[in-house]
């Protein structure tokens, strides 16, 4: 029986109380704004001005394609990939993104052989990363989770009993991993909207999204406290819609919707910041490149290009031109910077002065990684 299994058994033996979110007055962490890419000097200047920093994200396909079939992380391959990065670390925040089949296996819960395999591997991998790179704060993407739909109902319309049961299920599934993370990065991407209206959600959808976002952050804050690891909760967010709901994939989210459905509930629920992800450079490369000969255009990307063409009243060919590519990059850059600026504005209004974050281990903070970033800013 492994330490992870013993840990899980201990938490399964009656911990069912859901504690309230921390009060604003008890806030101890500085606000955190981290992002995947800036895409323009102007956006970079704006991000730096609000304290933004890039984070490192390691996707499983970067170094461990076999993990999709084994459900285990090749830790030596992961360590080599991170250690041999020519550009070093962009900051002291890092994310491991292992989703397939890890999400499904963890969803099976304690008692499942798949759950044990995936959980043991994820715990061992993050422990290894923390020992090799002690100046970096490590986490996993999407941990912990909370389902938007419960038994066919949205979070907002589900019963209190159903919500409580869902929260406890997720705690049981993720407790061993949460105990090892230096910060928690649940995903609160917006996926719900109306394709016929360019992805913009209606009033009801906005209220439902807001309620779910707040619950995700509150539960993550609570889970960290329950495992004795009250680390910052810095959720993954995006200025564009993500797949999984009715919204048009990769369409830009209106600023007012971001404010109401994402930023404010994060701050109000006790979140410590935002981890902004767009993959903008990849998306721009997809929507601006002609499809390969004999291959149909991407089913999700092409409608976004068409929508932009209609909104800007320019031909698709213009968007694919050098000037069009530059303009699309600027739009993603501005969306990232705007998200960061809005978050800091809401934080300042809600939280007031901040108190510096304590070292994660209770000891003097370790030095930053020795590998300085060598790449020029975008």
Annotate each predicted stretch with a short phrase.
Residues 40-45, 77-83, 162-175, 213-224, ...:
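Alpha-helical scaffolding within the catalytic cores
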């Amino acid at each position: 029986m492994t330490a992870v299994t013993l840990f899980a058994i201990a938490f399964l033996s009656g911990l069912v109380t859901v504690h309230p979110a921390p009060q604003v007055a008890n806030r101890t962490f500085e606000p955190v704004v981290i992002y995947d890419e800036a895409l323009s000097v102007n956006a970079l200047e704006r991000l730096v001005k609000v304290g933004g920093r890039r984070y490192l994200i390691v996707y499983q396909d970067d170094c461990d394609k076999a993990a999709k079939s084994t459900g285990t992380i090749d830790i030596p391959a992961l360590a080599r990939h991170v250690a041999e990065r020519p550009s070093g670390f962009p900051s002291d925040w890092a994310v491991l993104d292992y989703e397939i089949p890890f999400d499904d296996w963890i969803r099976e819960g304690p008692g499942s052989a798949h759950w044990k395999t995936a959980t043991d591997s994820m715990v061992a991998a993050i422990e290894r990363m923390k020992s090799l790179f002690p100046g970096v704060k490590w986490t996993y993407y999407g941990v912990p989770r909370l389902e938007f739909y419960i038994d066919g109902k949205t979070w907002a319309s589900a019963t209190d009993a159903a919500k409580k049961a869902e929260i406890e299920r997720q705690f049981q599934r993720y407790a061993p991993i949460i105990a090892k993370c230096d910060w928690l990065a649940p995903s609160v991407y917006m996926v719900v909207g109306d394709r016929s209206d360019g992805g913009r959600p209606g009033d009801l959808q906005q209220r439902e999204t807001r309620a779910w976002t707040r619950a995700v952050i509150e539960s993550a804050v609570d889970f960290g406290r329950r495992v004795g690891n009250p680390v910052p909760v810095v959720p993954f967010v995006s200025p564009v819609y993500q797949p999984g709901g009715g919204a048009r994939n990769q369409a830009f989210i209106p600023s007012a919707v971001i404010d109401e459905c994402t930023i404010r509930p994060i701050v109000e629920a006790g979140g410590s910041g935002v981890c902004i992800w767009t993959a903008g450079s990849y998306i721009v490369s997809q929507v601006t490149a002609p499809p390969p000969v004999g291959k149909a255009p991407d089913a999700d990307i092409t409608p976004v290009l068409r929508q932009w063409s209609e909104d800007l009243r320019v031909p698709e060919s213009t968007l694919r031109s050098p000037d069009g590519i530059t303009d699309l990059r600027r739009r993603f850059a501005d969306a990232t910077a705007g998200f960061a600026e809005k978050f800091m504005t809401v934080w300042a209004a809600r939280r007031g002065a901040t108190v510096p974050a304590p070292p994660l281990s209770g000891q003097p903070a370790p030095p930053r990684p020795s590998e300085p970033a060598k790449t020029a800013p975008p």
